[in-house]
UniProtKB/Swiss-Prot annotation:
Protein name: Cytochrome b
Gene: MT-CYB
Protein role: Component of the ubiquinol-cytochrome c reductase complex (complex III or cytochrome b-c1 complex) that is part of the mitochondrial respiratory chain. The b-c1 complex mediates electron transfer from ubiquinol to cytochrome c. Contributes to the generation of a proton gradient across the mitochondrial membrane that is then used for ATP synthesis.
UniProt source species: Crocidura fuliginosa (Southeast Asian shrew)
Domain of life: Eukaryota
Gene3D superfamilies hit by this protein: Cytochrome Bc1 Complex, Chain C
Keywords, in A-Z order: Electron transport, Heme, Iron, Membrane, Metal-binding, Mitochondrion, Mitochondrion inner membrane, Respiratory chain, Transmembrane, Transmembrane helix, Transport, Ubiquinone
């Protein structure tokens, strides 16, 4: 009798994806983040579902409904903070996952990589709209500032912004539609993640050496299932510690003040995971230029496969490229720091320099470094 997991129509999909999947024998812990992102997404959908049962998407009651969840609903505070800090864990895993792809040349799987970039955009859109829902000061003003950027689009900009707002300012219509989009987008993300996996399994995983690993494969289960469980336990421990000991550490205290269109907060800033892009946006004095730079700061990932000039796929054996990669990481930390600072000297200049270095590194310095390394191989 044939094994049911290999014959049952549903089970054989699971089997070929998570059990009998041939995986390289040498993939490191940097390959854990895909499964961690899956766990994050499931956790966010579940906690979000329970929050949606008690939340009301109306400007008069949204703030009170979130307070009600925290005070009156059984373990509502836990669900709310798991959801808010779960988003932070999601982005930590996302950034590490993308960084791994850049370092080890995983972007050479074009379809997988491009769907990954689409996923990044979708998750960022979801997180932005979720931040608007509690209807605190930072929710309202963040929504106003970011949606207003679309007015920089020539000719149709103003109409587009008013169409998104559903009126002449961020108001009840905006909040209601943001709630609807925030609810549906995670399911679109889940579907895209399925396609992401589908394309990945067409080629098989990359590995730290960047070499073909067809000659040395091991089954995913038990080797990588147990490894993923360990990674998941570490992440759950980190998230639990954050939620139970300092749930508001990553949030903005201004969001505990109900939204007031007549009172602008002194420093409008997004959640920490958008600060690097926000710093790039602010570093360009022109509105349209800033918006373009903001979009390009993420969209630039799509052209990275075209900028690959090295003879090896991975940076494992390329010390000069490694150096440039870590300078890029340091630059992103600098941008994140600047994004949270007020617009005054010396932060403006530091932000402009860091933004310039970011684009220069990706578009010019790293490809040239790879070409120099190619020449050094001949010596």
């Amino acid at each position: 009798m044939n094994n049911i997991r290999k014959t049952h129509p549903l089970m054989k999909i699971v089997n070929s994806s998570f059990i009998d999947l041939p995986a390289p024998s040498n993939i490191s812990s940097w390959w854990n983040f895909g499964s961690l992102l899956g766990i994050c997404l499931i956790a966010q959908i579940l906690t979000g579902l329970f929050l949606a049962m008690h939340y009301t998407s109306d400007t008069m009651t949204a703030f009170s409904s979130v307070t009600h969840i925290c005070r009156d609903v059984n373990y509502g505070w836990l669900i709310r903070y798991l959801h808010a800090n779960g988003a932070s864990m999601f982005f930590i895993c996302l950034f590490l996952h993308v960084g791994r792809g850049l370092y080890y040349g995983s972007y050479m799987f074009l379809e997988t990589w491009n769907i990954g970039v689409l996923l990044l955009f979708a998750v960022m859109a979801t997180a932005f709209m979720g931040y608007v829902l509690p209807w605190g000061q930072m929710s309202f003003w963040g929504a106003t500032v970011i949606t207003n950027l679309l007015s920089a689009i020539p000719y149709i900009g103003t109409n587009l912004v008013e169409w998104i707002w559903g009126g002449f300012s961020v108001d009840k219509a905006t909040l209601t539609r943001f709630f609807a989009f925030h609810f549906i987008l995670p399911f679109i993300v889940a579907a895209l993640a399925g396609v992401h996996l589908l394309f990945l399994h067409e080629t098989g995983s990359n590995n730290p050496s960047g070499l073909n690993s067809d000659t040395d494969k091991i089954p995913f289960h038990p080797y990588y299932t147990i490894k993923d469980i360990l990674g998941a336990l570490i992440m759950i421990t980190a998230l639990s510690s954050l939620v139970l000991f300092s749930p508001d550490m990553l949030g903005d205290p201004d969001n505990y003040i109900p939204a007031n269109p007549l009172n602008t907060p002194p420093h409008i800033k997004p959640e920490w995971y958008f600060l690097f892009a926000y710093a790039i946006l602010r570093s360009i004095p022109n509105k349209l230029g800033g918006v373009l730079a903001l979009v390009l700061s993420i969209a630039i990932l799509m052209i990275i496969p075209l900028l690959h000039t090295a003879k090896q796929r991975s940076m494992m054996f390329r010390p000069m490229s490694q150096c440039m990669f870590w300078i890029l990481v340091a630059d992103l930390f600098t941008l994140t720091w600047i994004g949270g600072q007020p617009v005054e000297h010396p932060f403006v200049v530091i932000g402009q320099l860091a933004s310039m270095i970011y684009f220069m590194l990706i578009l010019l310095i790293m490809p040239i470094t790879s070409m120099i390394e190619n020449q050094l191989l001949k010596w």
